Amino acid sequence: MRNILPFLTRIPVKGDFEKARNELWAFPLVALVSSALPTLILYLGLPLSNLLAVLALYWTIGLLHLDGLADWADGIMAKGDRERKIEVMKDVNTGIAGLFAVVIVLLLQVYSLQLLPFYALFLAELNSKYAMLLALATKRPLGKGLGAYFMEGMNGRQLALGTLLYVLLGLSVVLFEPRALAGILGLLFGVHIIRISLKNFDGLNGDCLGATAEITRAGTLVVMALVWWYL
């Protein structure tokens, strides 16, 4: 797992670029690391803990995926054919669609956490990382960036092992709180983003992976917040 950490977090560990794509199965395990500090903040019940937890999350994982979400949203909302949408997505300038998407995702996370137990963010991060693994499993690269490099290393064995880890980590919470099972519905957000990306861009790049991660996490928290509110 050490080799994949530098690509998914800001934790200062040395990873081997060549070996990283052979550790894609460890994506779900990364959720344990990326959610550790935010979960501790929520567990301690500090003032404004929901806001502090989200800040701690992005301090841990960085803003790369959030930036990808902004670029992805600009591309999706652009009018024109596939080439035009890809051109807009790759533009370094952020448009109103990208800004709107980032603000909404951040607000959904902050406000949903107010209604949820301390371990909710871990489940949301688990879904987020697994959704990225599913995106890589499509093996439909757009361009020749990091996403394409990881897709080359993706295979059935890595997906199967990653899925097993996802299930085991999820069960560790579900057995304690059955309502947490509803969190699996958050994966549908990720699957939908993957489908939209393939339809509009005919492939997936790093921006699409970032959007998948961010929207899956926010969607999972919203679903769980609704379940906790009504049940």
From Swiss-Prot:
Coiled coil: none
GO molecular function (one): adenosylcobinamide-GDP ribazoletransferase activity
Cofactor(s), names only, from the UniProt record: Mg(2+)
Record pathway: Cofactor biosynthesis; adenosylcobalamin biosynthesis; adenosylcobalamin from cob(II)yrinate a,c-diamide: step 7/7
The keyword rRNA processing is annotated on this UniProt entry: no
Cellular localisation: Cell membrane
Signal peptide feature range: none
GO cellular component: plasma membrane
Keywords: Cell membrane, Cobalamin biosynthesis, Magnesium, Membrane, Transferase, Transmembrane, Transmembrane helix
Enzymatic reactions: alpha-ribazole + adenosylcob(III)inamide-GDP = adenosylcob(III)alamin + GMP + H(+); alpha-ribazole 5'-phosphate + adenosylcob(III)inamide-GDP = adenosylcob(III)alamin 5'-phosphate + GMP + H(+)
Membrane topology (UniProt): Multi-pass membrane protein
Residue stretches spanning the membrane: 24-44, 46-66, 96-116, 159-176, 181-198, 209-229
Presence of the UniProt keyword Membrane in the record: yes
Paired cysteines (S-S): none
Main location: membrane
InterPro entries registered for this protein in UniProt: CobS (IPR003805)
Domain of life: Archaea
Enzyme class at the top of the EC tree: transferase
EC number assigned by the record: 2.7.8.26
Xref: HAMAP family: CobS
NCBIfam families per UniProt: cobS (TIGR00317)
Family: Belongs to the CobS family.
Function as written in the Swiss-Prot or TrEMBL entry: Joins adenosylcobinamide-GDP and alpha-ribazole to generate adenosylcobalamin (Ado-cobalamin). Also synthesizes adenosylcobalamin 5'-phosphate from adenosylcobinamide-GDP and alpha-ribazole 5'-phosphate.
Protein name: Adenosylcobinamide-GDP ribazoletransferase
Organism: Thermococcus kodakarensis (strain ATCC BAA-918 / JCM 12380 / KOD1) (Pyrococcus kodakaraensis (strain KOD1))
